[in-house]
């Protein structure tokens, strides 16, 4: 959630400095125009558990100065903003006002608006798969794909045989889908051993309980046996279906025949 801009705070007033040509001018005014404005943003994480206030100063579409409540002071983005940053950081009352904006501006507006907002939550879709289809006891990368969820605060953890893995984990971070949902990939670098069970656990505000998806490390022979069993089962179903079809078709044909000699 972002609030833009602050009113009536002078720092949030959008200043448009434009030199207009006189109405009696007969030629096009080629003098330069200048645009300077300030944005005030409130970033909320898990409600108001953590609030970040950002104030950005932009001149001709280039940010030159900002205040970040996580930093606690003004920082120059370009040399143009350095004099103002040094000046305002030397004035305790200005810094105190900016730091207090987390409560006086962000949390204040959140508490008012929260009563009228509908909380949108979308449950994530979780899948687990290896990046390589190679034999066990070789280096591999297990991927936990978490997609189409909202809001963006999510926790993804890897377990091996019930014990949490804390090393060898790589994440893409949050990726915006462009439709108000997010996705992320959390990968575990490991050397799978036969019989090991890897579990990806996902916690999200839309879920009452964590979602867990398992991946079992199996040898090539075990996988072949499983595939053979599945293939045999499917083949058996096909033969059963064909047999039932022939049986019911014959039954229907016999019921349609009437013995000769009946009186009507």
From Swiss-Prot:
Region listing for Connecting peptide, in residue ranges: 216-225
Cytoplasmic side: 249-264
Domain Ig-like C1-type, chain residue ranges per copy: 124-214
Principal location: membrane
Family statement drawn from the similarity comment of this UniProt entry: Belongs to the MHC class II family.
Misc: The structure of the E beta gene is more similar to class I MHC genes than to class II, in that, unlike either the E alpha or DR alpha genes, (1) the core portion of the E beta cytoplasmic segment is encoded by its own exon and (2) the sixth exon of the E beta chain is not split into two exons, but rather encodes both the carboxyl end of the cytoplasmic segment and the entire 3'-UTR.
Name assigned to this protein: H-2 class II histocompatibility antigen, E-D beta chain
Organism field: Mus musculus
């Amino acid at each position: 959630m972002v609030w833009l801009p602050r009113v009536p705070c002078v720092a949030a007033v959008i200043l448009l400095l434009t030199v207009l040509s006189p109405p009696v001018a007969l030629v096009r005014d080629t003098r330069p125009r200048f645009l300077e404005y300030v944005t005030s943003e409130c970033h909320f994480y898990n409600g108001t558990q953590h609030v970040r206030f950002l104030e950005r100063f932009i001149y001709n579409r280039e940010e030159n100065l900002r205040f970040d409540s996580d930093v606690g002071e003004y920082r120059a983005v370009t040399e143009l903003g350095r004099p103002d940053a040094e000046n305002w950081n030397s004035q305790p009352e200005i810094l105190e006002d900016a730091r207090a904006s987390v409560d006086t501006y962000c949390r204040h507006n959140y508490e008012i608006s929260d009563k009228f907002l509908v909380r949108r939550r979308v449950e994530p879709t979780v899948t687990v798969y290896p990046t390589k289809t190679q034999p066990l006891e070789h280096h591999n990368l297990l991927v936990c794909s978490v997609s189409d969820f909202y809001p963006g605060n999510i926790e993804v953890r890897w377990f091996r045989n019930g014990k949490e893995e804390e090393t060898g984990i790589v994440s893409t971070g949050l990726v915006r889908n462009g439709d108000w949902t997010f996705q992320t990939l959390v990968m575990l670098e490991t050397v799978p051993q036969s019989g090991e069970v890897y579990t990806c656990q996902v916690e999200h505000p839309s879920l009452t309980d964590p979602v867990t998806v398992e991946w079992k490390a199996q040898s090539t022979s075990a996988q072949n046996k499983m595939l053979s069993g599945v293939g045999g089962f499917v083949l058996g179903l096909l033969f059963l279906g064909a047999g039932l079809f022939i049986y019911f078709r014959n039954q229907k044909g016999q019921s349609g025949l009437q013995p000769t000699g009946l009186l009507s």
